[in-house]
């Protein structure tokens, strides 16, 4: 982990590892990760790599995160009705790991290649310190600040046309799941579990890592080239089939049934 110290001397991670290693019966533990990427990382662990590791995604409430009227959502948020809106969201948008600089560069490149986007496209930034970024964008920018109200977040997703997540590291981001549930195509770097969520050129666009040119291509493709209605419908369907509460609950039930069956076999 890049956040851990060099390993010289004593550190909390090493002490925690030793305590976990000493747990009796740990070889019978079934581990669950929420992404295939994390499952692959776990399989390389000297501590749990020989255990059963299942992959079950986190669920989303599709009765809450769903499509609503776009025009009404924009009216409630004070966003323009005559522009295509690109959303970036983070708890703290100035966090370098969230890749805001790549989106800024991508917007600059889009405006250079497609000057009409200066008039018909804008960026919406959701999260703390959003106002600090206004001067960085050449496209019009609307900072919404930090929002905690769930219904307002649903309105934000429904108000925009594409959600962009240029994170440099991530697992299975809820923001992508929430946007897709609201019928919003997503564009994101090929990192962590993001490519598991975004099916390239089917419900969004998977971008080459740290490539602002490809990021610009992906955003422009979603807004101007692709069959937008198809992308939107595919995004909603992906969430229903993979991330709905009913689907995830069924997977957990299957794991518990498997664990109980194995336990009874060992008792016999």
What are the residue ranges of the model-derived segments?
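Nucleotide-activated donor-binding/catalytic signature segment of Leloir-type glycosyltransferases, i.e.
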Residues: 114-121, 127-154, 162
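Short hydrophobic beta-strand element within catalytic cores of glycosyltransferases
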Residues: 185-188, 198
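Aromatic "clamp/platform" in nucleotide-sugar-dependent glycosyltransferases that forms part
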Residues: 168
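A short, well-ordered alpha-helix in the C-terminal region of glycosyltransferases
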Residues: 227-242, 251-254
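A short helix/loop element that forms part of the nucleotide-sugar donor recognition site in Leloir-type
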Residues: 66-79
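A short, active-site helix/loop in glycosyltransferases that binds the activated sugar's phosphate group
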Residues: 9-55, 60-64, 70
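Conserved acidic donor-binding segment of nucleotide-sugar-dependent glycosyltransferases
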Residues: 200-201, 205-212, 221-226
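Conserved donor-binding/catalytic core segment of Leloir-type glycosyltransferases
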Residues: 80-98, 104-107
């Amino acid at each position: 982990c890049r956040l851990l110290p060099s390993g010289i001397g004593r550190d909390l991670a090493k002490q925690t590892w030793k305590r976990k290693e000493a747990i009796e019966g740990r070889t019978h533990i079934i581990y669950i990760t929420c992404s295939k990427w994390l499952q692959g990382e776990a399989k390389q662990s000297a501590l749990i790599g020989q255990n059963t590791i299942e992959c079950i995604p986190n669920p989303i409430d599709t009765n809450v995160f769903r499509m609503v009227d776009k025009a009404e959502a924009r009216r409630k948020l004070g966003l323009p009705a005559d522009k295509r809106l690109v959303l970036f969201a983070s708890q703290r948008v100035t966090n370098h790991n969230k890749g805001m600089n790549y989106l800024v560069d991508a917007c600059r490149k889009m405006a250079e290649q497609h000057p009409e986007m200066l008039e018909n496209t804008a960026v919406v930034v959701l999260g703390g310190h959003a106002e600090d970024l206004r001067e960085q964008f050449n496209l019009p920018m609307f900072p919404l600040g930090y929002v905690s109200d769930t219904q307002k977040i649903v309105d934000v997703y429904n108000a925009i046309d594409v959600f962009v997540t240029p994170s440099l590291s991530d697992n299975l981001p809820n923001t992508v799941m929430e946007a897709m549930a609201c019928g919003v195509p997503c564009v994101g770097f090929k990192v962590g579990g993001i490519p598991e969520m975004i099916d390239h050129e089917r419900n969004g666009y998977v971008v080459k890592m740290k490539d602002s040119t490809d990021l610009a291509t992906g955003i422009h493709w979603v807004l101007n080239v692709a069959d937008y209605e198809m992308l939107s419908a595919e995004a909603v369907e992906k969430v229903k089939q993979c991330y709905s509460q009913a689907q995830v609950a069924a997977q957990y039930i299957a794991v518990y049934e498997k664990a109980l069956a194995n336990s009874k076999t060992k008792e016999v």
